Design a protein with these regions (language model features):
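Generic detector of contiguous secondary-structure segments
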Residues: 11-29, 129-144
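Acetyl-CoA-dependent GNAT
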Residues: 14-18, 22-99, 103-106, 117-119, ...
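C-terminal "cap" of GNAT-fold acetyltransferases
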Residues: 130, 137-144, 150-153, 157-181
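Extreme N-terminal starter segment of soluble prokaryotic enzymes
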Residues: 7-9
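Conserved glycine-rich acetyl-CoA-binding loop
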Residues: 79, 103-118, 122-127, 138-145, ...
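Residue-level signal for alpha-helical context at structural boundaries
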Residues: 37-39, 115, 138, 165
């Protein structure tokens, strides 16, 4: 559970307040999963980087492309320290986790992400979704390990989702899923 003396509270995020606001997600990584075609399918191997790397990307709360987003924040007082967001994909009855982020490196590995994951999983179950689904990158080894720890498995990937150079950039899109029913 939560390991700090302070009181952390999980609350629904108010769409009126947060919609359209941007944030930067950052992560550190020591390596990546190399995914390459083989004669009978695909081979996936972990490859360490020569030195640890930090990557980041900008994102937005309540992205316009989400069907009917549900979001929760982890707060210490009024300070937002973590965030999770998802929405039902009506066409296939899966709940897509569009974001889960503990915003400050110093707050990571303290259980915030796990509490947020349990909260959004319950919300997904309440929608009647058959499965949780999410996207991560082959170079985000900590995220992959976190999702596996929370019962997700790799269900697919796209070698060229972001650019024609994704394999060379070691940033291949990986889809991970967890059956709910």
């Amino acid at each position: 559970g939560w390991e700090r003396g302070e009181c952390m509270e999980i609350r629904p995020l108010d769409r009126e307040i947060y919609a359209g606001k941007t944030f930067t997600a950052r992560y550190r990584t020591n390596g990546y999963y190399e995914i390459r075609p083989s004669e009978t399918g695909f081979q996936m191997d972990y490859v360490p980087f020569a030195e640890p790397t930090e990557r980041s990307f900008d994102d937005v709360f309540f992205g316009e492309w989400l069907e009917d987003p549900i979001a929760f924040g982890a707060f210490e007082g009024e300070k937002l320290i973590g965030y999770v967001e998802g929405s039902i994909e009506g066409w296939n009855n899966r709940f897509r986790l569009s974001n889960i982020c503990v915003l400050d490196f110093s707050e990571r590995s303290r259980g915030v992400g796990t509490v947020l994951m349990k909260t959004i999983e319950q919300a997904a179950e309440n929608t009647g979704a058959r499965m949780l689904i999410l996207e991560t990158q082959s170079c985000n080894e900590n995220a992959i390990a976190f999702y596996k720890k929370n019962g997700f498995e790799i269900v697919g990937f796209d070698l060229y989702a972001y650019s024609n150079d994704d394999p060379e950039r070691h940033e291949v899109r990986i889809e991970m899923g967890k059956k709910l029913h």
